[in-house]
Amino acid sequence: MTSKVANTEVAQPYAQALLSIAKSKSLTEEFGTDARTLLNLLTENQQLRNFIDNPFIAAENKKALIKQILSEASPYLRNFLLLLVDKRRIFFLPEILQQYLALLRQLNQTVLAEVTSAVALTEDQQQAVTEKVLALTKARQVELATKVDSDLIGGVIIKVGSQVIDSSIRGQLRRLSLRLSNS
C-alpha cells in the first residue's frame, strides 16, 4: 500500500466528520473557503508545513499556532484542527482538507476541472472552459484549478476526474509523432 493511499484512508473518516459538523451547523461553504485558504497556506509556506508535520514540536505549540492562524475562522473548524493535534493526526491535514473539498464538491454536484495551459488564462477563457466542462459533465457547477506549464507551447489540457482533454500543441505534436512512427 502506497503512502498516498494510506494517507487517503486515514484522511477520509476525518473529512467525513468535518463535513458532518459543517452540515449540522450549515457552514459547509464557509468551511470550504477556510479549507482552500489553509491548503494554499500549507502549500506556499514550507516552514508552516514543517512545523505542523514535526513530531518533536510540542502539541501545545502547534495548538497555539492554529489558534493564531485561525482566529477569524469558525470555532468548530478551529476545534476540529485542535483535535487533530491531540489525536496526532495533524500530519494528515492537507489530505483531510482535500478530501473535505472533494466531499463538498460531491454534495454540491460540482466537478473539479484541472486546467493546465501554456500561459495564464483570461477571465473569458476560464469562462469558456467552465462552459465546456459543464456541457460535458452535466454538473451544476465547475471548480477550476488552473496552472501554467510553458512546456505545452500553446493550448490547454483539461482533466475532469479520469477524463483528459488534451488540446495542447505539445499533445498534438506527440500524437503526430506517434502516427508518423507507426506509418
UniProtKB/Swiss-Prot annotation:
Signal peptide: none annotated. Its main location: membrane. It is a peripheral membrane protein. GO terms for cellular component: plasma membrane-derived thylakoid membrane; proton-transporting ATP synthase complex. The keyword Ion transport applies. Disulfide bonds: none annotated. One of its GO terms (molecular function) is proton-transporting ATP synthase activity, rotational mechanism. It is found in: Cellular thylakoid membrane. Keywords: ATP synthesis, CF(1), Hydrogen ion transport, Ion transport, Membrane, Thylakoid, Transport. F-type ATPases have 2 components, F(1) - the catalytic core - and F(0) - the membrane proton channel. F(1) has five subunits: alpha(3), beta(3), gamma(1), delta(1), epsilon(1). CF(0) has four main subunits: a(1), b(1), b'(1) and c(10-14). The alpha and beta chains form an alternating ring which encloses part of the gamma chain. F(1) is attached to F(0) by a central stalk formed by the gamma and epsilon chains, while a peripheral stalk is formed by the delta, b and b' chains. Belongs to the ATPase delta chain family. F(1)F(0) ATP synthase produces ATP from ADP in the presence of a proton or sodium gradient. F-type ATPases consist of two structural domains, F(1) containing the extramembraneous catalytic core and F(0) containing the membrane proton channel, linked together by a central stalk and a peripheral stalk. During catalysis, ATP synthesis in the catalytic domain of F(1) is coupled via a rotary mechanism of the central stalk subunits to proton translocation. This protein is part of the stalk that links CF(0) to CF(1). It either transmits conformational changes from CF(0) to CF(1) or is implicated in proton conduction. PANTHER family: ATP SYNTHASE DELTA CHAIN. This is ATP synthase subunit delta.
